[in-house]
Amino acid sequence: MKKRRILFLGETYRADAITWMNGLKEFGDFEIITWELKTSNSGIFNRIKRIFEFGHAFFKIKKIIQLQKPDMVIAERTTSYGFLAALSGVKPVAIAQQGRTDLWPEKSISLPLKKLIQNYAFKKSDLIHAWGPVMTISMIEANVNMNKVLVLPKGIDLEKFGNNNNANPEKICAIVTRSLLPEYRHDIILKSFAILNQKGIDFALTIIGDGSQLSKLKDLAKELSIENKVNFTGRIPNTALPKLLQQSNIYISMPITEGVSASLFEAMATNCYPIVSDIPGNQSWIEHRKNGQLIPIDDYKKLAEELIWSFENTEHRQQAVSKNRKFVEKNVDYSINMKIIADKYHQLIDGSKAE
């Protein structure tokens, strides 16, 4: 039997896109073809160039469809690739909202246009992915037909992200795995560890990833006199991540906005105790001082206090990480969740062919 073919519209280098595509191949036996914008989104010149590229994207996608004849189109982001998927003419279409809302930044002058584009994508799609409950709030506000919405995270590979944690119990071994971008507030994290350093509390802080803030953050670490205790790894292969998480006892993430964080799930799976910003995307999974800690946005002093509290309360941390592992096994297992998603796609294709 010929494999069914899916056209994926989105940035194929992103970890969650790779998870999505690989899961469909593994659990749905789909063949995946891809298309994405080639121009970078950094810098004003590139953004203007990217807008022109987006304007011609429809014709390029139509040509791919004529040649490859996909059975279905899927796309990330309801305000860009999701809109192109809705315009493609292929049925069925599944789109995924990537954040708490894709209408971001919230004060952007292009917001009215983005709303129009998003509403069109929502109406024309056959399935809308909400990778977590927090995403449904903006969908309800946009009057989306919630019968089309599947609330389910893609999940993580629980074999790869095992719970055999071997962090040094004698000191804070903290890890940050978010991109080095302003919205992730790595500077707040560094300032909190400077307070710990001033108090004579031993720690090792590992900051994974790359991004526009790297040189600024390295300079800040020097300015705070903690550069010898902070390890900036740069970008690493995803295969190296589980081991680094397993060598850490505390996971920190301080974003100002969040949809559903696979990074948080990875930390929960590997018995890293999560300390995260107190925002809706994190409140869906973390209860303060129950299975982690929630910190007000940009409050580095509070973060320092809670880091000390969590490290001193060893029994609490042990109970929390055990609870978190059970939670991800029940709710965020990639092999279970991606099978559900792949089966749903087959059903949609069957229904479309029957019409």
Regions found by a protein language model. Give the residues of each.
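Aromatic "clamp/platform" in nucleotide-sugar-dependent glycosyltransferases that forms part
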Residues: 256
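A conserved nucleotide-sugar
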Residues: 183-186, 190-232, 239
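Membrane-proximal helix-turn-helix segments that form the acceptor-binding/catalytic region
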Residues: 59-63, 111-128, 137
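Conserved donor-binding/catalytic core segment of Leloir-type glycosyltransferases
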Residues: 7, 129, 167-193, 206
